[in-house]
Amino acid sequence: MGKYFGTDGVRGEANVELTPELAFKLGRFGGYVLSQHESEVPRVFVGRDTRISGEMLESALVAGLLSVGIHVYKLGVIATPGVAYLVKSEKASAGVMISASHNPALDNGIKFFGGDGYKLDDERELEIEALLDAAEDTLPRPSAEGLGDLVDYPEGLRKYQQYLVSTGLELEGMHVALDTANGAASTSARQIFADLGAQLTIIGENPDGLNINLNVGSTHPEALQEVVRESGAAIGLAFDGDSDRLIAVDENGELVDGDKIMYIIGKYLSEKGELAQNTIVTTVMSNLGFHKALDREGIQKAVTAVGDRYVVEEMRKNGYNLGGEQSGHVIIMDYNTTGDGQLSAVQLTKVMQETGKKLSELAAEVTIYPQKLVNIRVENSMKDKAMEVPAIKTVIERMEAEMAGNGRILVRPSGTEPLLRVMAEAPTDEEVNYYVDTIANVVRDEIGID
């Protein structure tokens, strides 16, 4: 991570940390870096989610892009993976998404995609940061005829919707409940699943700029669970604010997280001989039960640090086509370059249709170990140094010794927020609570803030 770029672009409180001035510079400098090797006039696609600050930041970002001669295609409200798909499929120079994903409405973020549809690597981000920190802006300032054009491009959303529909199966007769988190999926999920023929019940589809992720979506699936139970839906599908995540709900109202979704899709692909190298890429946060289920099926796994960018790096490096995170980021590389909640939803319903099994039956093949995760607010300057604090290091070692190999502990910094995450897994809830609470109390005493 750099000074400005975290694990998922530049994020901060809108108009306080992520200001219009910074957005303009990111557009200007980011656009310049990403278009240096273009033989034709560069084209950049820009999308946003439904946050009230989105249009403000979009206007500033677009101005920066236009100022270095880049043609900008405004996609409007669209899922982050929709931007990635369109950049690659339409051979654009780059893409930019304005979103803070699952964060609350007061936050926003800006993330870049290269012309290949993948998020930027560290080297490109550092190039942009160097320009941001330069004492003077020395980039070219073209006169009127050299400025970029601004194009509204609503067709992009329709093309993305049609593409996702083309990857699925007819769902005639299936009752699907959707929760679009009052976010980016509110412009697309209804149409996608209607085109597939599903009977729909939808919540979280009325964004007002302030209610994105508010008690809805993949981080708050309780409302969808209730809707599924009351409506008799066969499946519930909850997206986050920018629709790069999916959390599902089975017909009984029980949660099906990213680990189970990856297992279900991965086993399906493996049985068809379509799981590249018979391997799923996952992170250190995946549940022990997920690993045991893969072992039982003879499916290999590659484990990375937390963050979908690290999963994607591993997939690209070794030619894998399925990976993701427990949080619901699922990357299906045969179809898109990044985590795509709506794509994952289409593929999950496809497995249900092809196998004729209920989601609860498919998910029951993974027995999840009790897991507890506690987030502790700390200073940003301390979250990467926690393991250097003697008391924290000692209590973790003591808890691991007590586990005696039957469970695990993970303490890590958030990539996007001033938080230290303490996670444990063990055979019983009582043990998990004991391990996590013991460590969390020491962390709070040593480096926690109110």
UniProtKB/Swiss-Prot annotation:
One of its GO terms (biological process) is UDP-N-acetylglucosamine biosynthetic process. The keyword Coiled coil does not apply. The modification Phosphoserine is found at S101. It comes from the Bacteria. Belongs to the phosphohexose mutase family. Mg(2+) binds at S101, D240, D242, D244. HAMAP family: GlmM_B (MF_01554_B). Activated by phosphorylation. One of its GO terms (cellular component) is cytosol. This is Phosphoglucosamine mutase. It catalyses: alpha-D-glucosamine 1-phosphate = D-glucosamine 6-phosphate. Keywords: Isomerase, Magnesium, Metal-binding, Phosphoprotein. The gene is glmM. It holds the Pfam family PGM_PMM_III. Its cofactor is Mg(2+). Binds 1 Mg(2+) ion per subunit. SUPFAM superfamilies: Phosphoglucomutase, C-terminal domain (SSF55957), Phosphoglucomutase, first 3 domains (SSF53738). GO terms for molecular function: magnesium ion binding; phosphoglucosamine mutase activity; phosphomannomutase activity. The keyword Heme does not apply. It is an enzyme of class 5 (isomerase). Its EC number is 5.4.2.10. Catalyzes the conversion of glucosamine-6-phosphate to glucosamine-1-phosphate. The active site is at S101. InterPro entries: A-D-PHexomutase_a/b/a-I (IPR005844), A-D-PHexomutase_a/b/a-I/II/III (IPR016055), A-D-PHexomutase_a/b/a-II (IPR005845), A-D-PHexomutase_a/b/a-III (IPR005846), A-D-PHexomutase_C (IPR005843), A-D-PHexomutase_C_sf (IPR036900), A-D-PHexomutase_CS (IPR016066), Alpha-D-phosphohexomutase_SF (IPR005841).
